[in-house]
Amino acid sequence: MQADAGSNLLRNWIARAAAATPDKPWVVSAEDGRTITYRQLHGTVARFATFLSERGLGPNDRVALLANNSVEQLLCYLGVMAAGATICTVHVEMNRNQLDNIFERLKPKLIIYQDGLQLDDMLQNAQAPKLRLGRWDRSEPDTLFAKVLGRAPSLQPDKSETGAGPNDDAVILFTSGTSAKPKGVVLSYREFLLNIDPLAAGWGITAADRLYDFRPFSWNSAQTLSALGVVNRGATLILAEKFSASRFFQHLRDHGATIATGNPTTINILLNSGQTAHHDDLPNLRFMTSSSAPLLLGDWKRFEQKFGIPVAQGCGTSEVGWIAACPGEQRRLGSVGRPFAYLDLAVVDTNGTRLPPGEIGHVELGGWPDLAFRYLGEDGEIKIHSRGRLRTGDLGSLDADGFLTLSGREKELIIRGGAKISPVEIDSFLMQHGDVIEAATVGVPDAIYGEEVVSYVVTRPGAATDAGALLEYCAALPAFKAPKRILLADALPKTERGKLDRKALAERWKSDFQSRPTESDEHQTRGNPGRAI
């Protein structure tokens, strides 16, 4: 473990890149080409240290940032963290009640927000000084960048005796989901920054790479891979404001991207978007990543066949960061790659005993004795949920070569008459049907078996396949795994991170069908599939 994993570690990465390639682009806007070099990043970070120090902000002082993807957002993010304060990224699509709850708990010393997002009214109840983000390349009075760039840089921009230490808080990340009270995940500088070198090595990132990302930078995965991983390697980030199927391949082509990020939802959208791009037209592109949820094998194969672009899968958690990754050249279909050695990942049974290769069990992490899952409590204090060896909530298996394959989330398992069924397995089977473009399986109440298997399916526009035909198709599954009802849907609910929202589907089922729970008689359940959403 690195001796100094505080804020100075990040400052040293920036200084190293600025010294080696001062005029190299650190970040480029995919939309308008605006560029910030490593020399400019280095100088601005030094001015952030002066600005925050003058306001009396230091280690563990919380700075909230509400902004969409932009070069200014990332510059502010790195500036606050490199100065040693605690950056708290908040998704701009939170509702008023969620924001009120967040700021009541967070008690930030400063709130920075993007203008033009109608946030002024939403932030009225927040008891903290507020600053508009502004533009880095344009003089706009009373904005953050007008104030930061007007400061002289700190005298020793790469070494600060007042910087944050390894155990000080680096980031607080807020989930959105469907809860009225978003969960605040707290990571120390040690926990956060020690993830960066392994993930950069795990994905095979080099200084020559130009990484393209569109994902919201309120996510841990985007922050660590695309903001910090790029700086760690002295690479270049091509930053898009948001995902656009119509512009995705054009962005990759125009900016010479070598790595493109993605997730199962965007891969599915691209598959069904009518885009005709091919890897032959993108000679610089090495591979595309997928994370946030297991990528169904059918989608994985279809994407590579249609576009000729290798897909490499990785995984992680908000509480730790990236756990496993694999460069496109070494990928294995279905796997999320090799776990990072420092996290000492194991697959264990319910008693904590390590399982042999190929057996499915609980994914558990270790690495160092004080590893902990920490959350922001209702009173604003940090609560330790668990410490030591920690279970992520994922189910998976390791093969003989150490590659990890995830089978789903433990809390999403369907338990039918004592038999445990992975909904991902059923989804994957349904997705192999030629007319199915999305599928999500959930467990619903059943008077006899406790839970029964129900699948929601989106079919291709104009497809003649109905729910009855899909039930017949599923007869090839073992009888206890086969859905007892299939409901056609126009779309499936997703979380902010693009994951299937099975909880929302289960709640929809309860609302629509709780008064008449499923029966185990196959004839009755096949009689009226309906359309649920």
Predicted regions and their residues:
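Conserved pre-ATP/AMP-binding loop-to-beta segment of ANL
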Residues: 5-7, 22-25, 137, 152-174, ...
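Gly/Ser/Thr-rich phosphate-binding loop
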Residues: 232, 257-262, 273-332, 344
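AMP-binding/adenylate-forming catalytic core of the ANL superfamily
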Residues: 94, 111-113, 260, 395-482, ...
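Conserved AMP-binding/adenylate-forming core of the ANL superfamily
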Residues: 26-70, 74-78, 95-100, 104, ...
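Conserved AMP-binding/adenylation subdomain of ANL enzymes
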Residues: 193-210, 217-259, 273-274
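AMP-binding/adenylate-forming catalytic domain of the ANL superfamily
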Residues: 477-500, 522-523, 527-530
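ANL superfamily adenylate-forming
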Residues: 116-166, 274
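Conserved ATP-binding/catalytic segment of the ANL
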Residues: 66, 356-358, 364-424, 431-432, ...
